[in-house]
Amino acid sequence: MTAGAVLLINPRMGTPRNAGLPLSILHLAAVLEGRRPWSILDGNLGLDVARAALDRLAARPHALVGVTVMPGPQVQPAIAISRAIRRAFPAVPIVWGGYFPTLYPDAALNAPYVDYVVRGQGEATLAELLDRVDDGAGVRDVAGLSWKDGGSIVHNPDRAVISPDRLPRVPYEAVTDIEAYLRPSFLGSRTAVYQSALGCRFKCEFCGVVSMWNGKTVLEAPERLRLSLGMLRDRWGADAVHFFDHNFFDREETSVPMLDVLGSLQMPWWCYARADTLAGFSAATWQKIRKSRLRMAYIGAEAASDEALKRMRKGSRVEHTFEVARRCREHGVVPEFSFVLGGPDDAEGDIEQTFELIRRLKTLHPEAEIVLYFYSPTPQRRNAPAADGSAPRLPVLQRYGPAGPALPATPEEWTEPQWVRWVCHQDAPWLTPRIRRRVDDFARVLACRFPTIQDARISRAGRSVLRNLARWRYATRRYDNPWELRLARRFIRLREPQIESL
């Protein structure tokens, strides 16, 4: 082992109650295992990460610090941690990776406390960067890396996506507090998180996965899935699984072997899925879905018209949404349908159409969960040449929406409240106060009329109170100013899937 250790940090983005295994940094740790010392710090466990990071850096020499950063609320704690490290240990390189620096590498590198950005899948890039740091060699040929050359920012060619089967498995046994991550959910009493596939071959206009993976999908072998989940179940007592895959059901022929594995493990599970893919599955495959104990699938319905779906480049049709709702009800699966509202072309018209489609879905499958977001344009990353010669990316986004503001140039600017709301799909610059209020009122009525099954904390009596209070408003479509529901929610706390989900 080389002397320089690596500290991998997951800044706070949630609460200890909702913390899942920090897979992004654990996958990086996997390529370091046996090669050099490493440790992780997870802000979601309630730690003072900046203080803990300084203590670890003081205890032994470190080759670098890696920080994973998502757009939105994780940027601010990432800034604070990186600033503290830079002040106390100015010679230790700081590397940012994850969605934020992949989508906005220039903004990340404009910060004086960020030395390198790892774009996209980071395992091989980090390992290669560490070799160069150890040797004092140049980094110009490290694929997937962005860096500073004097006063200029350099974007090296993109790195080809690597299949999970070619990478070492996650070192779960090295996580000293793994019990803190096996938490109760509506799936089970000890729910684990897992990722078996990377990327998505579709290019929906509003989705950041497009920029991260550029239409690529790589799948894990079924046997590796069996071994990993079997270890989590048999060694640590995990009894349910929340998949972080961007699109678990890529194709029917690849899904069937995975369903056979999950059927043998008998651990209830949740995943992301597409309506058109599931709607096209055979009756035999749907029987396998039932036997696998899939409890809920997060399905991007997105819009109420085929025209709107075409504008979004979704690649599916409204009929697929209704077909998959019917199939899910037949086979005991709860669909969690997400909708993207308020696109710049016809924000108000799309919203009213979507409300009516949601009502039809709730009639077809009353247990269906509904998640509402506002439209955000996809932030395409800069066109660095692809190391694998793959197709070029879509044009880089320079402004936020038509005639919208220019994108922020630093991490600090990205923490301004309006930008956090926009990138988290909670608002958009072209929306009027009336539209925002209309959506908020509808969402409140809908959530009270049909309380989410994901919240095990709320009592049966509490659910009944909310349902009955909202019943007349939902029946008469009187969504405006539901003051009594706002008051009731002060006393009856209800989980919001679009914020907390699992």
Locate the predicted segments by residue.
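Radical SAM enzyme core and accessory elements
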Residues: 2-11, 17, 58-60, 91, ...
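Structural motif
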Residues: 5, 63-64, 116, 240-242
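A short, glycine/small-residue-rich beta-strand->loop->alpha-helix junction that serves as a flexible
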Residues: 13-23, 70-75
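Flexible glycine/acidic-rich beta-alpha junction loops that bind and position SAM and/or redox cofactors
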Residues: 15-16, 104-105, 202, 253, ...
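Glycine-rich beta-alpha loop elements in corrinoid/cobalamin-binding modules
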Residues: 31-164, 377-380
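Catalytic cores of alpha/beta
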Residues: 105-110, 345-359
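Radical SAM [4Fe-4S] cluster-binding motif and immediate context
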Residues: 165, 172-335, 356
